[in-house]
Amino acid sequence: MTYEVAIVGASGYTGGELLRVLAVHPDVNVKVVTSREYANKPVYYAHPHLRGIYPASLKFKRLDDPDQLSDVVGDVDLVFLALPHKVSLHYVPKALEVGYKVVDLSADYRLKRVEDYKTWYGYEHPYPDLLEKAVYGLPELYGDKIRGAQLVANPGCNATSSILAVLPPAAERIIDLDRIVVDVKVGSSEAGAKPYRGGHHPEREGTARPYDAEGHRHVAELEQVIRDYTGRDVKVGFTPHAVSMIRGSLASAYSWLTKDLAPLDVQRIYAKYYAGKKFVKIVRGAPMPYPDVKNVYGSNYAEVGFALDKRVGRLAMFAAIDNLMKGAAGTAVQNMNLMLGMDEDEGLKNLVPVRP
């Protein structure tokens, strides 16, 4: 069976990655793509690397308003919303009303608490009922719920790397939940296709700088997942850094052990949570003892690892992902697969990492 999908907001980096991945998916056809900037132009006008991959007849359609959604998109099985935050907000209820399954790649439905949107995004969420309905789309932790979902909220890239690193030790309470600090190094593609000072790659090349050091909004997702698994509220110190790579999100997290453990004990905890998870690799030992974004470049894989600093009783936790893949489009396709009843690695398993 071939499923048909639409990508609403397909001209950005995430839209381009969705198109790249879905081009090799054996059971999915991209029927509709939308973009106001590139309306009526073939997809390769926005994504030149896809010239000859998609037919010239697949052209961007213009979509200006949620009320136009069904007329523009037509009959499809699932819609990817790759729209900016606050724009996607009003497309989701319309898409659900029409009957589409939805993977929303914005932040508009990731958080369960209405008050968190006021705190982190500065607006009152108008659809609290849909926040309850939305499933947080990290398949490694919420796969069973995603399978039956109509609306999946794709996680943020820095949230994904941080959660994969921190969640197993936090859930098992082997670390002090009141003293967790996360440091993320992220590539310039996280800033999106439209350049601005600070996000534009020439401004980031050859340097590294912190930003949102008093609290990046992705930390709300990490705190929410820890709360789901431990039953208690936590506050995590979180600082991302803009670095000169283009792709990649490397989370380095730190906390203090609550019990005396050996490295093998910690490794078993990670294995407990990620055994059988097709896209998570636990990294230990030679030749590279810790996660490296270069090892997951262009793929949906995540590398996860740790270091146990016995001298001070500290656990360092690491995860490396490609921010455009496992941090966005790759996980979105993984979610789509689960929602449509396919194997979760379909269309993704053959996208092996690119190196060097």
UniProtKB/Swiss-Prot annotation:
Matching entries from InterPro entries are given as: AGPR_AS, AGPR_type-1, LysY, NAD(P)-bd_dom_sf, NAGSA_dehydrogenase, Semialdehyde_DH_NAD-bd
What chemistry does it catalyse, as a reaction equation? Answer: [amino-group carrier protein]-C-terminal-N-(1-carboxy-5-oxopentan-1-yl)-L-glutamine + phosphate + NADP(+) = [amino-group carrier protein]-C-terminal-N-(1-carboxy-5-phosphooxy-5-oxopentan-1-yl)-L-glutamine + NADPH + H(+); [amino-group carrier protein]-C-terminal-gamma-(L-glutamyl-5-semialdehyde)-L-glutamate + phosphate + NADP(+) = [amino-group carrier protein]-C-terminal-gamma-(5-phospho-L-glutamyl)-L-glutamate + NADPH + H(+)
Q: Is Secreted tagged as a keyword?
A: no
What pathway or pathways are given for this protein in its record?
A: Amino-acid biosynthesis; L-lysine biosynthesis via AAA pathway; L-lysine from L-alpha-aminoadipate (Thermus route): step 3/5; Amino-acid biosynthesis; L-arginine biosynthesis
What stretch or stretches form a coiled coil here? none
Q: Which PROSITE patterns match?
A: ARGC
Which SUPFAM superfamilies does the protein's record reference?
Answer: Glyceraldehyde-3-phosphate dehydrogenase-like, C-terminal domain, NAD(P)-binding Rossmann-fold domains
A Pfam family (short name) is Semialdhyde_dhC_1
Q: Where does NADP(+) bind?
A: 11-14, 323
Listed under GO biological process in this entry are: arginine biosynthetic process via ornithine; L-arginine biosynthetic process; lysine biosynthetic process via aminoadipic acid
**Keyword vocabulary terms for this entry:** Amino-acid biosynthesis, Arginine biosynthesis, Cytoplasm, Lysine biosynthesis, NADP, Oxidoreductase
Active-site residues, as the UniProt record annotates them? 157
MF GO annotations: N-acetyl-gamma-aminoadipyl-phosphate reductase activity; N-acetyl-gamma-glutamyl-phosphate reductase activity; NAD binding; NADP+ binding
The record's similarity note reads: Belongs to the NAGSA dehydrogenase family. Type 1 subfamily. LysY sub-subfamily.
Q: What does this protein do?
A: Involved in both the arginine and lysine biosynthetic pathways.
> What is the protein's given name?
Putative [LysW]-L-2-aminoadipate/[LysW]-L-glutamate phosphate reductase
Q: Where is the organism placed in the taxonomic lineage, from the top?
A: Archaea, Thermoproteota, Thermoprotei, Desulfurococcales, Desulfurococcaceae
